[in-house]
Amino acid sequence: MYLQGFGNYHHSEAVKGALPTNQNSPQHCSLGLYAEQLSGTSFTRPRHNNLRSWLYRILPTVTQGTYYPYEFNVMQPFVDELSPNAMRWSPLYNSSQIKCDFVEGLFHIAGSPLVNTYTYYCNHSMSDKYFANNDGELLFVPYAGEIHLHTEFGKLILSSGSIAVIPRGVKFKVEVISKEAKGYLCENSGNPLTLPQLGPIGANGLANPRHFQYPVAAFENSGGEHTIICKNQKKLWFTVCNHSPLNVVAWHGNYAPYCYDLSLFNTINTVSFDHPDPSIFTVLTSESEIPGVSNLDFVIFPPRWMVAEHTFRPPYFHRNYMNELMGLVYGEYDAKKEGFIPGGISIHNCMTPHGPDYESYEIAASQDLKPNYINSLAFMFETKDYWQVTEQAYRHPSRQMDYLNCWQGFKIEFSQ
């Protein structure tokens, strides 16, 4: 069961009577609860941008105790000098017999001043272990397995073909439902993700607000040792407390985790000729200080019909002002016949040329242009700042050192 609607002002209570009816902070909360506000923006942001929620919890967060440096640091140093070459990786993870939870399975791939990208692998649930990211919100893009995200606001169910966003500062734990789970993770430290403007598309299309789902209140009332791991200023810290931090019995507000089924994306595409720009596939965006230039765009290339006439249908050859990090959830990407599979990653930074490989080009340039259905799901994290690659990703054996060879078959066919 979920609450529906992107950015709506929601309210939910796991126990009847836990929510105050006429105010936020009563002198004495019902059921012996404590009122606590969680702010996602400054108090004075314009009303349409203002994000906050009121939580009614068994214990206030201030009881969590002292934080100490954690033994594992998820953030990794970047390569000192990065060439303008295109880069691609095969999937980093194979199945492991070693127990590995969500935090232990994070692998830092690349970052920019306000965005970082990781992959995650987990085959073990976080039972009495919790995570919070004070540095930004987290966008989950799974490609294998099913996980349940137990958050301060309630539970989200997540599997391949769906996404979830955990806001900055919200504590959660990951329960692994399948044998193992794998996915991509994007950390956004800029403006919170929101729906893109639709412009001439009109009032409807792309991701519809009513399809975004928010959790109903659920809580843990358990004692014993509970470990909280917190990412704060690019470092991991931990504390041990004697009560679960997921102790919110009721909440109301517009700052909360949410999930979305990508199959509900209303894809816009040409029904005449040419290939529209990929901005028409934007699901969520984080706006920068420059109008029309995003800090982060989350873009998908979903299952869709291709019907353009007298047109080269795959993505065109391109040198981009923006910086692209791509992944594949399932299927075969229409611009890459080989080498780019689910779990893989490619990075094409500003002005780095990219486009269909030679085999894909040859097929698309000569095929009979009948309506064609593409059953795949690729995505892109696009940012205005260069993707800096971590040393561990740059030197990882899954990096395809021969990636540029996929474009070496092209010949000069010009004739006057």
Curated annotation (Swiss-Prot):
Pathway: Amino-acid degradation; L-phenylalanine degradation; acetoacetate and fumarate from L-phenylalanine: step 4/6. Its EC number is 1.13.11.5. Its cofactor is Fe cation. It holds the Pfam family HgmA_N. CDD domains: cupin_HGO_N (cd07000). Keywords: Dioxygenase, Iron, Metal-binding, Oxidoreductase, Phenylalanine catabolism, Tyrosine catabolism. One of its GO terms (cellular component) is cytoplasm. The active site is at H275 (proton acceptor). The keyword Transport does not apply. GO terms for biological process: L-phenylalanine catabolic process; tyrosine catabolic process. Homogentisate binds at Y333, H354. The keyword tRNA-binding does not apply. It catalyses: homogentisate + O2 = 4-maleylacetoacetate + H(+). One of its GO terms (molecular function) is homogentisate 1,2-dioxygenase activity. Fe cation binds at H318, E324, H354. It comes from the Bacteria. Hexamer; dimer of trimers. PANTHER family: HOMOGENTISATE 1,2-DIOXYGENASE. Involved in the catabolism of homogentisate (2,5-dihydroxyphenylacetate or 2,5-OH-PhAc), a central intermediate in the degradation of phenylalanine and tyrosine. Catalyzes the oxidative ring cleavage of the aromatic ring of homogentisate to yield maleylacetoacetate. Belongs to the homogentisate dioxygenase family. This is Homogentisate 1,2-dioxygenase. The gene is hmgA.
